[in-house]
Amino acid sequence: MMSVIIALAALALLMLAAYRGYSVILFAPIAALGAVLLTDPGAVGPAFTGLFMEKMVGFVKLYFPVFLLGAVFGKLIELSGFSRSIVAAAIRILGRRHAIPVIVLVCALLTYGGVSLFVVAFAVYPFAAELFRQSGIPKRLIPATVALGAFSFTMDALPGTPQIQNIIPTSFFGTNAWAAPWLGLIGSLFIIIFGLLWLERQHRKAQARGEGYGTDLQNEPETPDDIDLPHPLIAIAPLLLVGGLNLLFTHWIPQWYGASHELTLPGLAKPVVTEVGKITAIWAVQAALLSGIVLVLVCGYRNIRGRLAEGSRTAVGGAILAAMNTASEYGFGAVIAALPGFLVLSKALAAIPNPLLNEAISVTVLAGITGSASGGMSIALAAMSETFVAAAHAANIPLEVLHRVAAMASGGMDTLPHNGAVITLLAITGLSHRQAYGGIFAITVIKSLAVLFVIATFYVTGIV
């Protein structure tokens, strides 16, 4: 019992620190190693070097280029006036009252096209900030709006989504990304409808109080007022290019390099072997972002050139902060998952009798503890997938349903205050947990209820 309390105390400390605005880069190792100290004092050093730093550095190695290119792309979209051009067109066509659905739609299209959640946050923020400012919608609702579009139904519920949360279950259940399509569509509609209703209700309440976009805000878009705005079709072209090329490169890269690639250079003592399958998605989004950056520079250089040096420095600083925040969370999750309290908790969750509820609760709780949807789901399925499969066969539950429930459950409690994506999104928007986390939490609750709704729908109708 004490081991469980230690693990949960570390989690509570990190969540409290994140909510109060303390640096997660500092408090993630403090919380993780504090738990190790209380469990086995002699293991603190090895746990820090061999677990925390190993996972943290591994995350940076894989994903920092994505953070960097995403931040630069978003900054150029902002400086070029592309974001303001698209916002002006959206207001002309749809009116200011549809600002929230427009941002949700843009985020959804990008994530369903395979663009990383982190990249979407960087790329969409300039549009969202400009549109919300002109529409008089509080800036504090931007993170929840982006979360609804990028961190919810297109992440793991919508059939066919290429996001990793929808791919992980395939290796455990022998399914594919289109598993349980009707349940996925039903869950997606549940999230979209109730998410938009909640956001619009918050907007109306803010209007009634006379609350506008806000003042004295940080990380505001810096598009100068004296530039000529490009045509909206030119402005939206880089976003479409990134989404399209990301999809194409995902298919092309394995064809170019094969299953693995050996790098041989005169100065190397031995060849560097890369397993292409594991890195394809990352290379694809990097190539797509580079192409998008080049297109923005070509089409908008006249507006960008005077602010390129300053803007690029700001983008690099933002990318470093966002990547290190998320990497620290990754290290924290690795340490906590190795503690005896975590194993006790995992075994306790396995005792839940209903197979779908067992899977949903196990995945979402472990995702919440580790602060990672993919991490929590991987741990849960690695430990319990055989049990889930046996129980599903005994209850005549198709494995496709297990896939969809696991994927959707991973995106529930993973958005607690210490989650890396949440911290990154707040850092990009220049908002604190106190200002904006309430909205993200509301989307989290809706997302969690959607999983229960999908389970109930299956049991009542048998639809898959």
Segments and roles (model prediction):
Residues 6-18, 29-38, 67-72, 106-111, ...:
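Hydrophobic core segments of alpha-helical transmembrane domains in multi-pass membrane transport
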Residues 7, 39, 182-311, 428-429, ...:
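Long, contiguous bundles of hydrophobic transmembrane helices that form the permeation core
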Residues 20-24, 60-63, 74-84, 110-123, ...:
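Short helix-coil transition sites and intra-membrane helix breaks within transmembrane domains
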Residues 26-29, 48-84, 109, 276-341:
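Core transmembrane alpha-helical segments of multi-pass membrane transporters/permeases
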Residues 64-70, 93-130, 323-331, 352-390:
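Hydrophobic alpha-helical transmembrane segments of multi-pass integral membrane proteins
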Residues 71, 85-87, 119-131, 160-172, ...:
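Re-entrant/interfacial helical elements at transmembrane boundaries that shape
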Residues 90, 94, 425-446:
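Interfacial loop-to-transmembrane junctions
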Residues 97-110, 137-154, 180-185, 189, ...:
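Alpha-helical transmembrane segments of multi-pass membrane proteins
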